[in-house]
Curated annotation (Swiss-Prot):
Biased composition, class Basic and acidic residues, residue ranges: 65-74, 286-296, 566-581
Region (Disordered), start-end ranges: 42-136, 232-268, 285-315, 432-585, 606-626, 690-711
Organism: Arabidopsis thaliana
This protein's UniProt keywords: Cytoplasm, Cytoskeleton
Name of the featured protein: Protein LONGIFOLIA 2
Disruption phenotype: No visible phenotype under normal growth conditions, but the lng1 and lng2 double mutant shows reduced length of cotyledons, rosette leaves, siliques and flowers.
Subcellular location: Cytoplasm, Cytoskeleton
Assembly notes: Interacts (via C-terminus) with TON1A and TON1B.
Gene designation per UniProt: LNG2
MF term (GO), any: microtubule binding
Compositional bias per record (Polar residues), positions renumbered to this chain: 432-461, 477-487, 501-516
Gene Ontology cellular-component terms listed: cytoskeleton; cytosol
Length: 905
């Protein structure tokens, strides 16, 4: 029901007013928005909340409304004085609170309509107010009900969204004021009602503008964005306040870095300190960039970190230089590292001199003369180190300031040589290096008078002569020209490294592993002076002087023993003293002269074929080698460390690589394949001895024991294949003891009853029979048949076929124990078995040859499979184990052929 209808009913029935009052009291308990009217000063709040442009209009309208309301209240009191007294008590308590719910709902709809009309349609209020504009009678019940229903329908959807929001104080006060005015004049016209609604809407609109400032700021309007900028500016100013003017000046001088990098750097340093970690500095940053890096951090420079921590951090960052960064720039040893290297070298010299005084020599004259040359060279080296130490420190410091490169990572004199040898890199640009001073004494450099060297006879050798030679390798002469300016080191750095080189490089010079040898060669490329090649006299005299020829190095002549000896690089001075004692017992007239720098080179040179000349010049290193002729070596390709099945060395003989692969399952087949290739290329050279894999006695010559049961001259054979099959069976010994051959077949590695090497022995026998003039087997055309390569290949096929047929037969029949006692009654049965075996082999060979002549290439595979299935003697289950081996053989052959085509074509 509408509010006006309830008002009319309450006027007629006084008891109904009491009931309305009770209901309003209950509404006040459960619905707090129904609060009693309280006098509120609207003008002051409106003036505070409204913007300055709208204050005058709003104040004028409120004054006009208040005047109208007073006039209405006075006229109403004059008309009904008696009823007013009785009604005021009820109206003040019940009517304002009761009528607040529909009017507040209508008022809230007015609020929404006014705010929406500003953006959508200007004529919307006129359309909504036209039904109320035509009301002339205030107490017309029909029109009141229609108007109230229209208002309720129009505001019902909007009422739910605004019930959850708390109404502002200014809007609530304006609503209560309108309620009081409506209670005083319930009989006003519709025009006055519309004017009151417009005034209330203006009040509400003004207060909404004042209240919604926070909501507009949250929604992201321009006013909110402007207000949000101020605290951000204050935060920036606060962060700027931490920076000192000194830091700002330094920051202006250095190039600015991004703000994200500074924030990340400062936060990472704080976290690293809290976790006990250290920050690793960039290798490419200079020292000035490293100091200016702290300009962006909010902390002052004095509180960054103590000097001891900075020093330890710099040392850690130097130690953590990666290998890729070290390969880009040449690394110079630090001045303090050079000082330490010199001091340690002095102690080594003193220790060597002390130990040399305690030694006793059997041949004092020559040994002491050699030791005297050693000590003179060491003293000269020490003097040069002392003289160049000061210059070296100045040059290295100036070089570090120019290039701002990180300091070398060598922390001990023993590691100084390794670091210097690692960083020397090659470059593609050929640049001629500056000539090095001749007086710098380093390994492999001639020190001493040339007259003393010329007095040495060529027939004798100086044992324990460590004076280096003026010779230079070919590869080093070529590689010194191809060094870039980055790899050219200063003279002072070379002289400073000489102290540590003489200590650690003395024992490393002749026993270096293959992995560290290229690094040492890179260091020697710069330490050796460029000597002209046109000095054959000096070089010949230098070749006659030997290195330290200890018994350990004497064994390096044997290539197999070199693979088993470990490197002896850890003993520096002890190895020299041990070599002194051992060399005193070596005869000086020996003709063996070995001059190689490592075992790796000796192994590599052993792969080349031996020449007839006693001396051979190595094509890689340009040095002379005098080696006794041990045995003729086969020309093989050097095999890399990871052994591959594609290498030719894998099949022929053991690899010279330190990693050796021993193949057991394919040893005989590989030996057969290698020998077969040589035999096919040279069909007439059958005089080569063939090794048997089962025997360890070495190669065997063709013996007459294999041919004691040779076929008779007048024997009847249908074809030459039958005769050759009988020769195979007699030479292999299968016919002599068939049962024992079946047992030995089970124990054989290759799973074949006949050794594949027997074929070459048979061919050697045939070749020898051809040369004999009185041979009983020689007839018409026999010589041409034996020397024809086609016949040789045919015999090879027959031999392999017989071997496979025997393997299948023995596998199918199984293993039988040999008879230990010869029974004469069983001899006929034994002979019959042998004859039966021979007939089976001959018939199988004939069948295969007949099928081969009638076969068609298109149906070749199907015919072969069908014939194999029809053969009753074949058992496919027994040959399942050979399938992986066959597949591996085929794959290896295919891959080897492909690699050969790619590499050599």
């Amino acid at each position: 029901m509408s509010a006006k209808l309830l008002y009319n009913l309450s006027d007629e029935n006084p008891n109904l007013n009491k009931q309305f009052g009770c209901m309003n009291g209950i509404f006040q308990v459960f619905y707090r928005q129904h609060c009693p009217a309280t006098p509120v000063t609207v003008s002051g709040g409106a003036e505070k909340s409204l913007p300055p442009g709208e204050r005058r209009g709003s104040v004028g309208e409120t004054n006009m409304e208040s005047d109208k309301e007073t006039e209405r209240s006075s006229t109403k009191k004059k008309k009904s004085a008696a009823k007013e007294k009785h009604r005021v008590s009820f109206e003040s308590s019940s009517r304002p609170s009761f009528s607040s719910s529909p009017r507040s709902s209508s008022f809230s709809s007015a609020e929404v309509s006014t705010t929406a009309s500003q953006f959508d349609q200007p004529g919307e209020n006129l359309i909504r107010e036209q039904p109320n504009g035509g009301l002339m009678m205030p107490y017309d019940l029909k029109e009141l009900v229609k108007g109230s229903i229209n208002r309720e329908i129009r505001t019902r959807g909007e009422e739910a969204s605004f019930t959850q929001q708390q109404q502002p104080i200014s809007a609530r006060s304006s609503m209560l004021l309108l309620k009081e005015s409506s209670l005083r004049s319930p009989c006003r016209s519709s025009n006055e009602w519309n004017e009151g609604r417009g005034a209330a809407m203006k009040f509400k609109e003004s207060h909404r503008l004042s209240y919604d400032e926070r909501e507009m700021r949250n929604n992201g309007f321009r006013v909110g964005s402007k207000l949000k900028e101020t605290p951000r500016l204050s935060l920036d100013s606060r962060s700027n306040s931490f920076r000192s003017p000194r830091a700002d000046a330094a920051r202006s001088s250095c190039p600015e870095e991004p703000a994200t990098m500074t924030h990340r750097r400062s936060s990472s340093s704080v976290v690293a300190k809290l976790m006990g970690l250290e920050v690793i500095a960039d290798n490419s940053d200079t020292e000035q960039r490293r100091e200016n890096r702290f300009c962006d951090s909010p902390r002052p420079m004095s509180r960054v970190e103590p000097t001891a921590l900075q020093r330890s951090r710099s040392v850690d960052s130097i130690k953590r230089i990666p290998a890729s960064a070290a390969s880009k720039f040449p690394m110079e040893p630090a001045p303090w590292k050079q000082m330490k290297a010199g001091d340690s070298a002095l102690t080594v010299y003193g220790e060597i001199q002390k130990r040399l005084t305690q030694l006793e020599f059997k041949k004092s004259g020559k040994d002491l003369r050699a030791l005297k040359q050693i000590l003179e060279a060491m003293e000269k080296t020490q003097q040069l180190i002392d003289e160049s130490r000061d210059d070296g420190t100045l040059s290295t410091t100036t070089l570090m300031q120019r290039t701002h490169k990180p300091v070398s990572a060598a922390t001990s004199p023993a590691r100084n040589f390794k670091s210097s040898s690692i960083v020397v890199m090659k470059s593609a640009a050929p640049v001629s290096t500056s000539p090095l001073p001749q007086n710098v004494t380093l390994p492999n450099v001639k020190v001493g008078n040339s007259r003393q060297t010329r007095k040495v006879t060529s027939g004798k050798q100086n044992a324990m002569d460590l004076t280096p030679r003026p010779g230079l390798y070919k590869g080093q002469l070529d590689s010194t020209k191809s060094n870039s300016p980055k790899t050219v080191r200063s003279r002072q750095a070379l002289a400073a490294d000489a102290g540590s080189m003489t200590k650690s490089g003395r024992s490393q010079q002749h026993s270096v592993s293959p992995r560290t040898q290229p690094k040492k060669l890179g260091f020697e490329k710069q330490t050796r002076p460029t000597t002209p090649k046109s000095e054959p006299g000096k070089r010949q005299l230098g070749r006659q002087q030997t290195e330290v020829a200890s018994p350990r190095r004497k064994q390096m002549i044997k290539p197999h023993s070199t693979l088993q000896q470990p490197d002896d690089r850890l003993s520096d001075a002890r190895s020299d003293l041990r070599s002194l004692r051992s060399d005193s017992n070596i005869s000086l007239g020996s003709n063996v002269d070995i001059e190689v720098t490592s075992r790796h080179r000796l192994e590599r040179n052993c792969d080349f074929p031996e020449q007839h000349t006693p001396k051979q010049r190595s094509p890689d290193f340009g040095i002379k080698q005098d080696r006794p002729s041990l045995k003729p070596l086969k020309v093989t390709v050097e095999q890399p460390s990871p052994v591959s099945v594609l290498d030719a060395v894998f099949d022929e003989e053991d690899s010279p690589s330190p990693v050796r692969k021993i193949s057991l399952s394919f040893k005989e087949e590989d030996a057969l394949r290698s020998e077969e290739s040589e035999w096919i290329n040279k069909p007439t050279s059958f005089c080569r001895s063939v090794p048997f894999p089962q025997s360890n006695r070495g190669p065997m010559k063709p013996s007459s024991d294999h041919f004691e049961c040779s076929p008779e001259e007048g024997a009847d054979f249908k074809s030459g294949n039958h005769k050759y099959i009988l020769e195979i069976l007699l030479a292999s010994g299968i016919l002599r003891d068939l049962e024992y051959s079946m047992i030995s077949f089970q124990l054989h590695q290759t799973r074949l009853p006949i050794n594949p090497g027997l074929f070459f022995i048979l061919e050697q026998n045939k070749a020898s029979n051809v040369t004999l003039p009185d041979n009983k087997h020689r007839g018409r055309g026999f010589r041409q048949q034996q020397t024809n390569p086609t016949e040789t290949i045919r015999r090879k096929l027959v031999f392999d076929t017989v071997n496979e047929i025997l393997a299948r037969k023995f596998t199918a029949e199984g293993c039988i124990k040999p008879r230990l006692i010869a029974n004469p009654l069983k001899k006929l049965e034994k002979i019959s078995k042998e004859e039966q075996l021979l007939q089976t082999l001959c018939s199988e060979i004939d069948r295969l040859q007949q099928n081969n002549s009638n076969c068609i290439l298109e149906d070749d595979e199907e015919d072969i499979i069908w014939e194999d299935l029809q053969s009753q003697s074949m058992n496919l289950k027994e040959f399942e184990g050979e399938t992986p081996g066959i597949v591996l053989d085929i794959e290896r052959m295919i891959f080897r052929d492909l690699v050969n085509e790619v590499c050599f074509c």
